[in-house]
């Protein structure tokens, strides 16, 4: 990972937009600090298209798409798009309703199995708003020991589901999307960007293991300082890293992009 200050001017000037994670990237321990929100508006006012890419549920995306200076949100780690449409929002699910219902039944069975194996594992407080996955709190409101997390991950695999892990949540899903495939589909279907060009025209900012697909897919990638805690889980680390963590690091990344443009 290179220092943020080494971002080349021509690379910054070639960007049309910025994709960004929420928890522990834009948000600081769940809070949207002022410098991070100001940075979003600075990027927007400079003409960059902004898209949030998060493991959070689509209900979060509906609020963000209405109130923030973004084109929309890629939620559920890629499965559901939420986009601004006039004065309202529209939701685009990658699955049809029958498939979604079937997968929800299997996820409910998985939740019961995990409850038997690791009774202290708690579902996240936003799980009722989720359509495509279930999530356990491993670091947001409680810290689940690593050995217990491993047991949950093993149970997810035995149920033929897929697990992903952020800095705060452990996700289980039967969907095949990840953040990169969901983001590229959003850029293509909602913004009209050709996927091959989008990976160089859009940058990504993240901090954790479930950001790995985007760190690998996009040319220009940034990590806030706390990404160093997740480097061992990343096959491809971000290209540039900020000196500060979370929202303050995001603000520094935004400022560097704008300074070089």
Language-model segments: residues:
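Conserved acidic, metal-coordinating active-site core of Asp-based
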Residues: 110-217
């Amino acid at each position: 990972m290179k220092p943020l200050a080494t971002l080349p001017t021509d690379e910054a000037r070639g960007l049309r937009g910025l994709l960004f994670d929420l928890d522990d990237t834009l948000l600081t321990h769940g809070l949207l600090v002022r410098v991070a929100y100001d940075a979003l508006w600075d990027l927007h006012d400079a003409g960059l298209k902004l898209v949030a890419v998060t493991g959070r549920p689509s209900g979060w995306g509906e609020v963000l798409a209405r109130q923030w200076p973004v084109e929309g949100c890629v939620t559920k780690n890629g499965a559901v798009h939420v986009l601004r449409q006039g004065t309202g929002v529209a939701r685009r699910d990658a699955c049809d309703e029958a498939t979604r219902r079937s997968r929800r039944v299997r996820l409910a069975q998985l939740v019961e199995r995990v409850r038997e194996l690791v009774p202290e594992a708690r579902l996240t407080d936003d799980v009722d708003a989720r359509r495509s996955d279930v999530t356990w709190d491993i670091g947001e409101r409680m810290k689940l020991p690593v050995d217990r997390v491993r047991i949950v991950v093993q149970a997810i695999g035995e149920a033929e589901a897929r697990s992903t892990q952020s800095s705060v949540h452990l996700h289980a899903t039967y969907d095949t999307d990840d953040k990169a495939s969901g983001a590229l589909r959003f850029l293509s279907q909602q913004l009209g960007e050709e996927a091959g060009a989008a990976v160089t025209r859009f940058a990504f900012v993240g901090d954790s293991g479930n950001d790995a697909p985007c760190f690998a897919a996009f040319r220009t990638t940034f990590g806030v300082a706390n990404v160093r805690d997740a480097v061992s889980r990343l096959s491809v680390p971000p290209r540039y890293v900020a000196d500060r963590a979370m929202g303050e690091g995001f603000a520094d990344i935004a400022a560097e992009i704008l300074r070089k443009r």
